[in-house]
Amino acid sequence: PATPGQAHKDPFHIPFGFALLSPKGNPIPLQLQAETSPKGNARILELTETEFTWTFVGIKEKPVPSLARNFSAPIVVDYDYTNEELVFLSRFDNDAFNRCEAMEALSLRCINEMVMDYERGTRMVINPHFKNAFEAMLTDKQASAAFKAIALTLPSERRVAESQPLINPLAIRAATRALRDQLGRLFSHVIMRVFDENLPSSTYSPNPTDSGRRALRAICFELLLAGGNAKSLLRARQSFETSSNLTERLDASVSYTHLRAHETGRNL
């Protein structure tokens, strides 16, 4: 849009990471109409005009686009993905950035739906697509703990507010808490298993592997507290009391402060 002193603005030069995924999750070889053969499975499309058209040939199945891959430019992509496509990207895209983007998009949709439930006075229910994507990410054996910690982090209340045209702080708070509570209850056993499987080394180290495990355990700890399962609460509290590093104790203290305020004083 026009701004004072600059009525006309030329388009930015935007490098746009792009790929197409087959229904099985495999990258499709990309061949432009003017080319004689495919040039790899991913491209950087150079956007230099307000409108641009590229035509790819040889696409035999309906693909799912993977856009702005690897954070190729600091832009917001406005593409109307279906819930099914977002679940697909969160599970099968070989671009880590876009997997996380798909998880955040699904979680925002889920929370915004729960906000509307709250405003209507109806029961707040988790979107089944987000529930499936969350469980798949939580149990993914190939992903690192550090990656899963990022992908499973739920949007902050501020981030939710930014996605809404009209902000209702009470509804946002209720929806975000309800989502954590329900995830903690639905997946308490799986979360507890992931929590136990990601014990860092006995001797504290800031190396990436142990740091990722601590980050994932912090996510699990928060969800276990939110779910309120008695066995999980006891197990989480024991871990907090016996933790050998300050990072986990601080993470636990923050979780208690935010989610179980009546226990904060005792734990601190």
Mark where each language-model region is:
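Beta-strand-rich binding/interaction modules
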Residues: 1-59, 63-66
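Long, ordered, helix-rich scaffold segments
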Residues: 8, 46-48, 55-262, 266
